């Protein structure tokens, strides 16, 4: 039952509650949706694992987004992949629709994902109306622009070439 990520209490929300993991200092997708367009234009969707098990990394990415001029909100939701894996397609669709409705209400035009599985789910759901950007691509793009402007980022002097990025997700 804890894998039912569309429930208020699930494996990830329970873990965050037990270990006191929360993000009250950050704008949430729910707050952005209630506010309406203009508060943020980007949603940071770290995925259920990162947002639950790596709160400092989640906050570090958030600081990086802010430092790079991104107006963003955080989602602590799961993309619904566990529901899909369990064959609960209607529940997964309802969860995704709720997230999409909030994205639309907030006027969000870009979703930054960490988990490639979440990225794939969102491209399928809303790729025609929202730009879905994997975090590594955004890091590289923003860092290259900063380097060209004379602001060192630690990425130089990497040449333009293909690199391998390993993630441990299920995809």
What are these regions (language model features)?
Residues 147-171:
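Redox cofactor-anchoring modules in respiratory/redox and cofactor-processing assemblies
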Residues 116-117, 138, 161:
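Short glycine-enriched loops at secondary-structure junctions
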Residues 46, 136, 167:
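A cross-domain feature marking catalytic cores of carbohydrate-active enzymes
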Residues 1-130, 142-146, 150:
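Iron-sulfur-cluster electron-transfer modules
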Residues 134-141:
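Short, acidic/turn-prone active-site loops that include or flank metal/cofactor-
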């Amino acid at each position: 039952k804890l894998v039912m990520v569309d429930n208020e209490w699930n494996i990830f929300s329970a873990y965050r509650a037990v270990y006191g993991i929360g993000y009250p200092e950050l704008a949430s997708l729910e707050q952005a949706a209630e506010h309406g367009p203009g508060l943020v234009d980007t949603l940071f969707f770290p995925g259920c694992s990162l947002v639950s098990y790596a709160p400092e990394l989640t906050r570090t990415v958030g600081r990086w987004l802010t430092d790079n001029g991104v107006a963003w909100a955080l989602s602590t939701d799961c993309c619904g992949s566990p529901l899909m894996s369990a064959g609960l397609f209607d529940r997964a669709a309802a969860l995704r629709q709720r997230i999409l409705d909030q994205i639309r209400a907030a006027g969000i035009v870009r979703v930054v994902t960490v988990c490639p599985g979440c990225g794939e789910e969102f491209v399928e759901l809303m790729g025609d109306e929202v730009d879905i950007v994997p975090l590594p691509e955004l890091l590289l793009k923003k860092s290259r622009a900063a380097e060209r402007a004379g602001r060192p980022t630690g990425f130089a002097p990497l040449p333009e070439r293909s690199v391998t990025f390993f993630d441990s997700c299920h995809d």
